[in-house]
Amino acid sequence: MGGDRELDVVVFGATGFAGRLVASYLAAHAPGDVRIGLAGRSERRLAEVRARLGAAATAWPLLVADLADPVSLGALARAARVVVTTVGPYRARGLALVQACAEAGTDYADLTGEVLFIRDSIDRCQDAAASSGARIVHCCGFDSVPSDLGVLLLHQAARAGGAGDLLDTTLVVTAMRGGLSGGTLASMMGQLDEVRASAERRRLVQDPYALSPDRAAEPGLGDERDLDRARYDGELRMWTGPWLMAGINTRVVRRSNAVQGWAYGRRFRYREVTGFGAGPAAPVLAVTASAGTKAAEAGLAFGPSRELLRRLLPAPGHGPGEKTRRTGFFRIQIHTRTSAGARYLGTIEAQGDPGYAATSVMLGETGLCLALDKDQLPDRAGVLTPATAMGAALATRLRSVGHTLATRQITQLPANSRPLADQPQRPRAAHPPQVPDCHPTGLTVMDFRPT
């Protein structure tokens, strides 16, 4: 289904901050013969957005649809091959659009970072999407495209090199600068409220395999909680601290492994951290950043401080200014070792504010990939992830617009090495041999000014 439609890609939420950025990206970069539409609640506001996009968007149709109106969502889904949506918080009001696309056989992509929303989407829409042929793809922005594609590419490199399965794998955010939007804040507050109100939902969010297609089949690998404090990592040889997006990214990556039949390996362990290097200031920076993360979490949970944050940060529908978006960037490394004893390094980098400039590129290219690259995509349908829905096809698109997604082996396979799939995993050495040029030395730049 979905092949004979009026439009190729529809941007739902095009009048919001993130939606305008995605629409602008498509106006500038989509091939001229791609049929694109703008959707939202107000035809007048949609027309205003279209007028600001220039000549490329002059003929783009406007579709009026409301998340509170299932009939309008059904019509929207049936009109397009792909719907990309930026309307959040998704948990509060996004499931109806997922259901409409799943039933219509329409591919869907969003920017959610909400574990509870994705779990509900899996439980309610997996069967319908698998039956209709729809690809429902969550987390198509900074969370969780770099993580998900990065690990997939490492897996493919290791397999091509005969290095076996992935074992301990760590994503390190080595540098980043960007802004924070009101929509992101609203999503964080909404999930926090739900977790506080329900012990069951709290346990689900804390489960490392919350998004697994078969929780009972997941391997028992011991403690896989996300890092919640500063610590010196003897294997990476640097100070590390918590990474704000680990709670969603790690679960998406683990789902990708399971959806692919645990292709990365049954003993694949994955975590994400912020890297602070090994210099004299590193422990202070790591401890300070960790304390700041905990203070922010406490502030979101406490009524008076939450209200203060609402006043200081942009309201939903607003976000960082043009200068912040243009001068932002992110740099990520992913370290892995394999069952044959090899080590690989992945590098993911992009210019532009991660949460908005870079994310608008990721979601825009996701929409084009789903619409135009069908013959290159994995033969899957259902509630998927960026890696399992698009894989290398999306990586190729992102590279073509300036993103770096690279892998390399940083140690050679030992002579006569064999995969250790049937052997017990050895514990990590406290101080393994140092591998030259395989770990970041810079300090993380965190700049979340509400400009």
What is the role of each PLM region?
Residues 89-207, 255:
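Glycine-/Pro-rich loop/turn segments that contact NAD(P) or position catalytic residues
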Residues 31-45:
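Conserved glycine-rich Rossmann-like NAD(P)H-binding loop of the short-chain dehydrogenase/reductase
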Residues 25-33, 260:
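A short, Lys/Arg-enriched amphipathic alpha-helix followed by its capping loop at the start of a domain
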Residues 9-27:
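N-terminal Rossmann NAD(P)H-binding glycine-rich loop of SDR-like oxidoreductase domains
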Residues 2, 156-431, 437-438, 442-451:
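C-terminal catalytic/substrate-binding lobe primarily of soluble NAD(P)-dependent oxidoreductases
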Residues 64-80, 86-89:
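Conserved Rossmann-fold cofactor-binding substructure of NAD(P)-dependent oxidoreductases
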Residues 53-69:
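Rossmann-fold cofactor-recognition segment
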Residues 8, 81-82, 107:
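Structural motif
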